Design a protein with these regions (language model features):
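Short Gly/Pro-enriched turn/cap motifs at secondary-structure boundaries
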Residues: 9-12, 36-39, 53-55, 81-88
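Short beta-strand-to-turn element immediately C-terminal to the catalytic PLP-Schiff-base lysine
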Residues: 22, 48-52, 65-67, 93-95, ...
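A short, Trp-centered hydrophobic/proline-enriched beta-strand micro-motif
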Residues: 1-5
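Short, charged, solvent-exposed linker or helix-capping segments at domain edges/interfaces
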Residues: 60, 75-77, 100-108
Length: 256
């Protein structure tokens, strides 16, 4: 399946939805565009967030179930991304898509609450992704530092590299604890809005710092595709952006 929230003019500000679903008694008529949709072409079922009443603000947003092949539903451009290139990311276009009334999820106006809840849980997953990227970059860097020699000794014997590895390790351990804490909150059915935002912010920042240092430790080899750290650095960047940017996480943390 695919979760369809972001639009060309509605990213961090999810309330500024331009996608409209007009109520025609026994059905809705959907028009608009969605961007950055993961599983855009491979999904068979889509949860689409759309505005039904602009005057009601976030209370005028609903979520609808759509299926691939519905008349007027077009899978458009596949994004040529910096990282996570194996992820199927597309633009979706909706031109007068007729949606049965029973395809609306929940009560009228439920869409915004649904979207925010989905993002809050998704942030824990992105934090775990970032943690995995950072840990992978650290493991590769540690192994490389034990093999690569300069000035008559392996580079892990140089204090400059030791300090980099030590900082990477501390960052990763902190991120791991925050990720596990937020996941535990969710498992225990506790409020995880704050802990999820903290975990995602810290883990994504750690992933970016760690992968940059991993490339530096590898030197020239870190810059070529023969070694995996350049890919990890490209993959790390998106964790600071999707499911809410680092700046949005700071807003969530401050408000909680």
């Amino acid at each position: 399946g695919a979760f369809c929230l972001s639009e060309p003019e509605a990213g961090s500000d999810a309330t500024s939805q331009r996608q409209k679903a007009i109520d025609y008694w026994d059905h809705y008529l959907l028009n608009g565009t969605k961007n950055w949709i993961t599983n855009g072409s491979t999904a068979s079922t889509y949860l689409v967030i759309a505005q039904t009443d602009a005057d009601k603000g976030h209370n005028g947003i609903n979520v609808f179930i759509l299926e691939k092949g519905m008349p007027g539903f077009e899978i458009s451009v596949k994004e040529d991304k910096l990282g996570i290139r194996g992820s199927d990311t597309h633009t979706l276009v909706f031109n007068d898509v007729k949606i049965p009334k029973e395809n609306r999820v929940g009560d009228n106006g439920f869409g915004f609450k649904f979207a925010m809840k989905t993002l809050a849980g998704g942030r824990i997953g992105i934090a775990a992704q970032a943690l995995g990227i950072a840990a992978g970059a650290y493991d590769l860097s540690l192994a490389y530092s034990k093999e690569r020699e300069t000035f008559g000794k392996t580079i892990n014997k140089h204090q400059a590299i030791q300090f980099k590895l030590a900082d990477m390790y501390v960052d990763i351990e902190n991120a791991r604890n925050l990720v596990y804490k937020s996941a535990w909150h969710k498992d225990q059915k506790m409020d995880y809005n704050l802990s999820g935002a903290v975990a995602k912010l810290h883990a994504s920042e750690v992933a970016m710092r760690t992968t940059i240092e991993a490339v530096q430790i590898h030197g020239g080899y870190g810059y070529v595709k023969e070694y995996h750290v350049e890919r990890l650095m490209r993959d790390a960047k998106i964790t600071q952006i999707y499911e809410g940017t680092s700046e949005i996480q700071r807003i969530v943390i401050a408000r909680n």
